[in-house]
Structure formats: structure tokens, C-alpha cells
Curated annotation (Swiss-Prot):
GO function terms (MF aspect): monoatomic ion channel activity; photoreceptor activity
Positions carrying N6-(retinylidene)lysine: 262
Functional note: Light-driven chloride pump.
Name of the molecule in the record: Halorhodopsin
Subcellular localization(s) per the UniProt record: Cell membrane
Organism: Haloterrigena sp. (strain arg-4)
Topological type in the membrane: Multi-pass membrane protein
Cytoplasmic topological intervals: 72-77, 148-150, 201-212, 276-297
Length: 297
């Protein structure tokens, strides 16, 4: 499944003696297409894996339509910011799961020595990490605007969240060393601690002052509990200790977590925003640097 491409223009030229290497470049592109088709076929023939992806495609598409309807009457600026961030969650998920089911953002990687599946090719759904890099900041953005969090605090937490996702991707794709996989995992966990600290210790105070403490508390615990499931599943699944050595079962685990952490979260938030727009519009504070608020001199 490996291919080489040649990009040296001094080799790929119009002359007959240089034609062979240019043909290799074309063949490499063909090999990439074949590789993608093979991955898509592997996904399609694995019932557990295939169904875990299509369920989310269907739910993401349905959620987009339902959420647009729920938010149809929202007019206040801050409320619309929350709605916009929330709508991005299923939109990103739909794109992601389409990439996974077609094999575009998935592929086999060989597990390193000392791994339980050392030497075996395991299908990596690395596209999930790209999804989380885009969708989880939207969740935090919506929560931050709901709680009227200071812009600087919001930036730091979202930056930590992105770092968490990207180092998680590095952990999943590292094949040179089993120890380095876990090193990236620990760095990702450290970033996660920053996010948890904000959600559990800092932002609740902001939410109480903004008059959104009740709904923030519900969404905070939903987010914290479900997000904790991702690193636990990584450790137990094929990417970690392989105690669950089925890619299909691992994929279903991630998909179920996504359903709760994204669609359920978004539905609860949008319903509250639509019914409590005045609370968000008026707020309890101003001039604290939160996006959407006027800054007082």
C-alpha cells in the first residue's frame, strides 16, 4: 500500500530518456487511488465499523435540519453567536464521517514493537482527530459565550483543546515507538486537564454571574463525563492496550460518545437558547472582554 512520488522536475521532462520516472509518478497516483478504494472496501465489509459511521452520518444530517428549525426565531447577537457555533458541530461531524466511510480519512498503520498487536496493520480512523480539532472548539466556544467568559480565558482553553486533539492524533499515528505513542497520549492528557479545570473550576462562576448557571451546569457535566470517555476508550481500544481489539467495537464506542457529546449537547443548548433568548441578550455583565459584548470605556 506504500507508493513513492517523484517531484524533481529535472527528472520529469519531455525527453524520452526521462519518461520512466514520470510514469512512476503517475503510477504512484494510481496506487493512492487503489489504496483508498481498498480502505473503503474494508470499511464497507465490516458491518460493525460501517454501521457506526452511517449512524452518525444520518444523525448529523438530521440534526442540522432540526437545529436550524429550533433556532429560526433567535435574533439577539450573543444568542446567534451561540447558535452559529453550535450548528458547526453537526456540520463538521457530517463532513468527517463522510470522509471516514469513503476511506478518505482512514488507513492502515503498523503497530510498533511492544504493542499488543505489534507488526499487524490496524485501521486507523485518523480523520476523527481532525473532526475533534474542529468540533470541540465549537463546543467550548458555545459554552464560553453562554457563560460570558473573558475572551482571553476562552482563547487559552480553546488553544489547549486544539493541542489536546493534535497530540492525540500524533499518539494514534506514531509507529516508530510504542513509548512515544504513550508520551503523546500523556501530553494530550495534560492539555485536557487545562480544559477540565476551566469547565469545572473557572467557568461556572462566570455562568452564575451571567444568569446561565443552571443550563451551563447541565452542559458542563454532560461534556466532562462524555469527554473523559475518549481517552479511556483510546487506552482500552486498538490504539492503546488493545484490550478491546475490534476496530468496529472501538468505532462504535467513539460514535456513541459523539452522539451524546455533540448532538445531545447541541439539542439541549439550542432548546434553552431559543426559550431564554432574553437572558442571553441582557446578560448580567458588560465590558469584560467577552465576544459579542460592547466594551465600555
Amino acid at each position: 500500500m506504500r507508493s513513492r512520488t517523484y517531484h524533481d522536475q529535472s527528472v520529469c521532462g519531455p525527453y524520452g530518456s526521462q519518461r520512466t520516472d514520470c510514469d512512476r509518478d503517475t503510477d504512484a497516483g494510481s496506487d493512492t487511488d487503489v489504496h483508498g478504494a481498498q480502505v473503503a472496501t474494508q470499511i464497507r465489509t465490516d458491518t460493525l465499523l460501517h454501521s457506526s459511521l452511517w449512524v452518525n452520518i444520518a444523525l448529523a444530517g438530521l440534526s442540522i435540519l432540526v437545529f436550524l428549525y429550533m433556532a429560526r426565531t433567535v435574533r439577539a447577537n450573543r444568542a446567534r453567536l451561540i447558535v452559529g457555533a453550535t450548528l458547526m458541530i453537526p456540520l463538521v461531524s457530517l463532513s468527517s464521517y463522510l470522509g471516514l466511510v469513503t476511506g478518505l480519512t482512514a488507513g492502515p498503520i503498523e503497530m510498533p514493537a511492544a504493542h499488543a498487536l505489534a507488526g499487524e496493520d490496524v485501521l486507523s480512523q485518523w480523520g476523527r482527530y481532525l473532526t475533534w480539532t474542529l468540533s470541540t472548539p465549537m463546543i467550548l466556544l458555545a459554552l464560553g459565550w453562554l457563560a460570558e467568559v473573558d475572551t482571553a480565558d476562552l482563547f487559552v482553553v480553546i488553544a489547549a483543546d486544539i493541542g489536546m486533539c493534535l497530540t492525540g492524533l500524533a499518539a494514534a499515528l506514531t509507529t516508530s515507538s510504542y513509548a512515544f505513542r504513550w508520551a503523546f497520549y500523556l501530553v494530550s492528557t495534560a492539555f485536557f486537564v487545562v480544559v477540565l479545570y476551566a469547565l469545572l473550576a473557572k467557568w461556572p462562576t462566570n455562568a452564575e454571574a451571567a444568569g446561565t448557571g443552571d443550563i451551563f451546569g447541565t452542559l458542563r457535566w454532560l461534556t466532562v463525563i462524555l469527554w473523559l470517555g475518549y481517552p479511556i476508550l483510546w487506552a482500552l481500544g486498538v490504539e492503546g492496550f488493545a484490550l478491546v481489539d475490534s476496530v468496529g467495537l472501538t468505532s462504535w464506542g467513539y460514535s456513541l460518545l459523539d452522539i451524546g457529546a455533540k448532538y445531545l449537547f447541541a439539542a439541549l443548548l439550542l432548546r434553552w437558547v431559543a426559550n431564554n433568548e432574553r437572558t442571553i441578550a441582557v446578560g448580567q455583565r458588560s465590558g469584560r472582554g467577552a465576544i459579542g459584548d460592547p466594551v465600555e470605556d
